[in-house]
Every structure is written in structure tokens, then in C-alpha cells.
Amino acid sequence: MIDFTITPELAARRDAVRAFVADKVVPFENDPRMTAHGPTEELRDELVALAREAGLLTFQVARAGVPAISHVEQAVLFEAAGWSSLGPVALNCAAPDEGNMFLLGKIANPQQTKEFLDPVVEGHQRSVFAMTEPGGAGSDPRQLATTAVRDGDGYVINGVKWLITGANGARTWIIMADLEGAGATLFLCDGDTPGIVIERTMDTMDRNYVAGHCVVRFDDLHLPASALLGEEGEAFRYAQLRLAPARLTHCMRWLGGAVRAQSIALDHARTRTAFGKPIGQHQGVGFQLADNEIAIQQCRLMIWWACWVLDQGQQGRHESSMTKAMVSEELFKVADRCVQVLGGMGISDETPVAGFFRDVRAFRLYDGPTEVHQHAIATRLLRD
């Protein structure tokens, strides 16, 4: 029997996260260090320091003083963190770091954990997952063009990646490359290693990730044997470990943003008058808010259901695909209706809603566009 009862302890943690984001993080949303390419490193460090002081930093990773939480519990807390796009940044549960911490926690050896994972968990450095390429390796990673060749006891990597989130300034790098004779392989190295070239930061419609999204070139990147992450040729299998949880945490965070956008739209509908009464009393507005509330609750329950599947020890690939496809599409509709309810204010930066609209539009592509998930779902249905 599925039971989504929120315990008093979980409710208290949720309320603490929500209060922290509302009281400490939201005031930074209009900070000049919020750039067209996302928050600067300086702003991120200041926010992380606040979360560390509050005892809430990286709450999703179990360690001394931080208890383990289930995927369902994570969903409750991540939604609270998503009240502001800067909330996950401050709390160190934003992409790509959150997914990278999960992956490294599964396959990194003790030395790699100490050097590359622990500093990310502690909020002292950021990480990247360098897979996506301009030639197509993204939704179809088997088109991987970045190569790795053996060089004595080590490796040499060459290739170009793009849309690499947070690359500029990140120190923990997970790189996927096609290793001669073995296939897709993961490597782990420091971002300051010679041969990693940040060509440029791309101009994208979203701006909620530190340092934005970059084009990266690997120019004879020499790595030692110790840079191998896991086993040779196992990158796709390892990526699957990260896949379902990362899809769902994206959904959790954006759900929090949708709840806030709905709250702003509701406040406006109660106070803005037109034709002799508050606009929310006009069906054209009220029905949009009702549709939003229905969609938000549907998304929440689907996320919790998929998380429950993971908590039963299942991989949840099918369930996470369905959830990611539905939630990304429905939350975009929620954002669009909030913009419509707000009218002219909705297309401005007078509220966070326009920014949420831009960000959640990009979410329909992150971790696989909707159509790729629909194809995977249909393939399984027809196979079974």
C-alpha cells in the first residue's frame, strides 16, 4: 500500500527549507550578480554560506549529522527548495551537482571520493557532467564523437562538448568519451587540468544555473589511469544509475517554482480589479487558476509515485520517463497560464514568473525532450 503521509519530522524539515528560501534566498533574486548566464560564482558562494550556517546545506546526502532520506522525502524537500530558482543553488541540491553527487556516491573509489566528491558535497566546489555534443550525443548518446585513446598507463581525450552546465569554474569534471576498443567510458578530473578549454558561454533562454551553459573543447587532454571512473566501456550503464533520480529531482525543483508562480498569480487575481470586480472572479481567469491547481497536484502525486517506485529498489526508468514527460509539459502550461493571468506584468521581470516561464520551457528539453521519453514509453508498451 502506497502511503504518502508526511511525518511531523519531515514537515518540520520542509518548513525549515521553505522558510530559509523565502527569508534568506528570495532577497537575492534581484541581486546584480544574477546575470544573463545565471548567478555568479561569488553569489553562489554567499548563498551556500547561508545554507551552511542554517544547517541545511546538501540535505539530500547522508553523512555525519545529516540523516539519509528516501526519494519521496527528497521530493517534499526539493519542492520546498524550488520556491526560488536560487534555492537549490544555495542548498547545494541544484543540477548538475545533485545528480553528479549521486553518481559519484555510487561508483567513485575512496581516493576519487575524497578528491572530487567530498568537496562538492561540502559546497566548496562545483561539478559538471560533460556528455552532450553539438553533433548529436545528448538524447542519443551513442552518437558520441569525443574520443579517448590509451597513452601508456593513461588516456588522451579530444573532442567538443556543448550545453555543459556550469563548466566555467567547476573543478569536478565527469567526462564521457568513446575509448578505443572499449566504447563509452567515464573519466574524472580537475577542471584546471591543461587541455580543458572553455570556448564560450552560450546565450540561452534560462538563467538559473551558475555560469550558464558552455561550449567546451578537449584539446589533447592527458589523464592518468586514476582518472578512470568505474570500468572501461561502462559509461551508459553508469549513466542509467543517475538517469531516473536526476529526472525526478528536476521535476521536484520545478514543481516548487510552479507553486510559487501560482501563488503570485492568485495574489494578483484577488487584488487586481477589472470591470467592477477582482479579475479572479471572472471565469476566464478563475478557470485558469483552477486548471493550474489541478495540474500542480497531479504533478506532485506523479512525482511521489515515481519516487515510491525507486524507494522499492526498482530502477524506475519507465516511471521516471512518464513523470518527466508529463510534469515538464504540465508545468510549462502552468507557467503560461500564470503569465496570462498577470497580464503585462507577467511578461516583465517585475515578478519571478517570466523567469520561471523561460526556465521551465527549457526544462521540456533537459534530461531528454518529451518526444524522446514518449518514444521510450511507446517502445516498452509495444514490446510488452
Question: What does each of the following model-derived ranges do?
Answer:
Residues 97, 137, 162-167, 207, ...:
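Glycine-rich phosphate/pyrophosphate-binding beta-alpha loops
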Residues 214-241:
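A short, charged helix-loop
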Residues 145, 158-199:
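A short core secondary-structure module
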Residues 143, 194-224:
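Flexible, small-/acidic-enriched active-site or ligand-binding loops
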Residues 136-140, 155:
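Hydrophobic, small-residue-rich alpha-helical packing segments that form membrane-like cores
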Residues 123-132:
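A short, Trp-centered hydrophobic/proline-enriched beta-strand micro-motif
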Residues 69-71, 139-142, 166-171, 209-210:
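Short glycine/proline-enriched turns and hinge-like loops at secondary-structure junctions
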